[in-house]
UniProtKB/Swiss-Prot annotation:
It comes from the Eukaryota. PANTHER family: GLUTAREDOXIN-1. Residues 3-106 form the Glutaredoxin domain. InterPro entries: GLR_AS (IPR011767), GLRX1 (IPR047185), Glutaredoxin (IPR002109), Glutaredoxin_euk/vir (IPR011899), Glutaredoxin_subgr (IPR014025), Thioredoxin-like_sf (IPR036249). The keyword RNA-binding does not apply. The gene is Glrx. Its main location: cytoplasm. The modification N-acetylalanine is found at residue 2. The keyword Plastid does not apply. This is Glutaredoxin-1. One of its GO terms (cellular component) is neuronal cell body.
């Protein structure tokens, strides 16, 4: 169930972030990504606490990405990590390049 839930969210050409609304790093990640000109429907924040499977989802994220912490940011089908990884990519210009590469931004 958790595996199915996560796998159906992760899609090429889309950015998906698994979050918990009370997490300050999740809020920072949302703030960073929400400032970018995404094409409609290509940025999704998934609140894992809205399901009854929060622990199972985090266990599957651990299996999939090597970490069960949130946020877990997927650019296309690739997990780039969490908030600090996103900040690092933003600072070195890699974030915009990757988002353009998957066609997620309005140019």
């Amino acid at each position: 169930m958790a595996q199915e839930f996560v796998n159906c969210k992760i899609q090429s050409g889309k950015v998906v972030v698994f979050i918990k609304p009370t997490c300050p790093y999740c809020r920072k990640t949302q703030e960073i990504l929400s400032q970018l000109p995404f094409k409609r429907g290509l940025l999704e924040f998934v609140d894992i606490t809205a399901t009854n499977n929060t622990n199972a989802i985090q266990d599957y994220l651990q299996q999939l990405t090597g970490a069960r912490t949130v946020p877990r940011v997927f650019i296309g089908k690739d997990c780039i990590g969490g908030c600090s990884d996103l900040l690092s990519m933003q600072q070195n210009g890699e974030l915009t390049a990757r988002l353009k590469q998957i066609g997620a931004l309005q140019l």
